[in-house]
Curated annotation (Swiss-Prot):
Heptamer of 7 subunits arranged in a ring. Interacts with the chaperonin GroEL. This is Co-chaperonin GroES. Keywords: Chaperone, Cytoplasm. The gene is groES. GO terms for molecular function: ATP binding; metal ion binding; protein folding chaperone; protein-folding chaperone binding; unfolded protein binding. It is found in: Cytoplasm. Belongs to the GroES chaperonin family. Together with the chaperonin GroEL, plays an essential role in assisting protein folding. The GroEL-GroES system forms a nano-cage that allows encapsulation of the non-native substrate proteins and provides a physical environment optimized to promote and accelerate protein folding. GroES binds to the apical surface of the GroEL ring, thereby capping the opening of the GroEL channel. GO terms for biological process: chaperone cofactor-dependent protein refolding. InterPro entries: Chaperonin_GroES, Chaperonin_GroES_sf, GroES-like_sf.
Amino acid sequence: MNFQPLGKRVLVKRVEETKTTASGIIIPDNAKEKPLMGEVVAVSKEITDIANGDKIVFAKYGGTEIKLDNNEYLVLNLDDILGILK
């Protein structure tokens, strides 16, 4: 299913963090915080500074979670994006 964000929004797939610490301790899913980084999957036509495939950092409480084709995504307003990782 294709999703085209409207307004000044982007569709982001969260970057999954590792499930173990450097010393090998396994972190259960319910103890992990949701990552604040993701990869841009779709961009509104109004946004020119961000492109598909960019890795971004976003605000902790920003965005709306949605599910498409059994995958979880986040729809973010441009104001919730803090920066692009290069």
